[in-house]
Amino acid sequence: MRAKKQLLAALQDIVKDMGLAWPEKATIDTPKATGFGDLAANIALVLAKQAGQNPRELATRIADALRNRDADITAIDIAGPGFLNVTYSQDFWRETILRAQEAGSAFGSSDTGAGRKVQVEYVSANPTGPLHIGHGRGAAVGDSLARIMRFAGYDVSTEYYINDAGRQMRLLGLSVWVRAKELAGRPVTLPEDFYRGDYIKDIARELMEKEPGLLDLDDAAGEDRCFAYAMSSILDGIKQDLADFRVEHQVWFSERSLVEGGAVEKTFNRLKEAGLAFEQDGALWFRTTDFGDDKDRVLRKSDGTLTYFSSDIAYHDNKYDRGFDLVVDIWGADHHGYIPRMRAAVAALGRKPEAFDVVLIQLVNLLRGGELVAMSTRAGQFETLADVVKETGADAARFMFLSRKSDSPLDFDLELVKQRTMDNPVYYVQYAHARVCSVLRKAAERGIEMPAQLDGASLAPLSGDDEMELLRLLDRFEETVAGAATALAPHHISHYLMEVAGALHSYYARQPILNATEQDVIVPRLALLRAVGCVLANGLSLLGVSAPESM
């Protein structure tokens, strides 16, 4: 937000000139009610003790300095115990249009991240079956967060961790092997916890057709072959489903590579040398209680098998070795209890707490016409992400996933999401962009020319309250993006876009654009709409949602 940046810089200079230190509790906010200026600052209240002055007296002193320093300010009111309510000129707000025109697709970007290297890991579902709708929410959050952080000046790398080691993988191979025998008419005993979905039968049938001698193998070799083929097949399907959902992972990282490459043992040795790993009852333990965990954790069981935690520690060690300043893991909410031990591991690796963060993804309750759809991957009862995207479209699904805070449960009604009405959030926002494009097209058809470059004087007729409201809202875009990146909260963007769309729809309903009686307001209003369209398009792009020009 240009206004907030400008006011902050001016206040910091004033405080410095007073020979005082900038207080940590100083804030600059947008007043929720009208009549209290464009911005409100509490600087006099939190600086009064240090300055040895009454807050209102100090506020008067600061206000006088502000008036002399910033010509864009038209009014400063001192409210209550000493709040500064600052109002900027209409010329100042109209310049938002010029900045949007100049920046185009970069409008709203910033250097907030200052090139900080960030890795975002998301989805990372076991390659034991197709992605379901819950994975889709994590995919939308992770992919959008990466887009937002890049736009805010971070150097972001995205990654999918392939869980291709451990019990679930052995169970996948066994499930396909048993189904292959069953398809061949051989007597089988179905394991209690095997994967039951029809996709397992399909994989078994496909493999038998490609390799007629499959069942000549003994059980161990057969299970290994079935595992390798099934994992490759399922992973290919996952990659395609994500591509169709407009989700990109730059790196696909194998868990097995950590084990076979010696990274896990290397991490064990590192922890032992630091006195943080110890043997007890034939097992290897990690002393996570030294870092605030409620109990120590097993790394290697007494039978020699590795825990998931051991690979995860080695994996994060690898991440930091690759030079990332911040590692962001996006996990299902059922992994909440895993966070303390992972933070302990990061600390044991010698990393600062701020180098690691977790975004939790709450469950998605899939509904169809208000009726809950039961889901279980192992039982083969689930709505795949591919089916959902095919039915609703990627735009609607992504926007719906991003419409609420990620750690809040989400009801996803397939029938509601498909509606092309203003009750559907994605339609509401996309229609606002299409409406802007429609007006601009009609203007061109009527021979109304939009200058390639506008200037402040040509925009002067924009002076209405609703126009100033729109301009102040557009000015907030950069701040909203930066805040979403810092808070790891993509839903901030969807909420903001709903607000912009609402303001645009209201403005369109109240103010004539092409048929305005005052001819001198037509081009300025078109320029305002074009700036709104720029913000809507840029914001939707950050969510991985299209900005249609007609609907």
UniProtKB/Swiss-Prot annotation:
Matches recorded under InterPro entries: aa-tRNA-synth_I_CS, Arg-tRNA-ligase, Arg-tRNA-synth_N, Arg-tRNA-synth_N_sf, ArgRS_core, DALR_anticod-bd, Rossmann-like_a/b/a_fold, tRNAsynth_Ia_anticodon-bd
Keyword list, A-Z: Aminoacyl-tRNA synthetase, ATP-binding, Cytoplasm, Ligase, Nucleotide-binding, Protein biosynthesis
Cross-referenced PROSITE patterns: AA_TRNA_LIGASE_I
Superkingdom, natural source: Bacteria
Catalytic activities: tRNA(Arg) + L-arginine + ATP = L-arginyl-tRNA(Arg) + AMP + diphosphate
EC number(s) from the headed UniProt entry: 6.1.1.19
GO biological process assignments: arginyl-tRNA aminoacylation
Any one annotated GO CC term: cytoplasm
Intervals of motif 'HIGH' region: 125-135
Oligomeric form and interacting partners: Monomer.
Name of the protein in its database record: Arginine--tRNA ligase
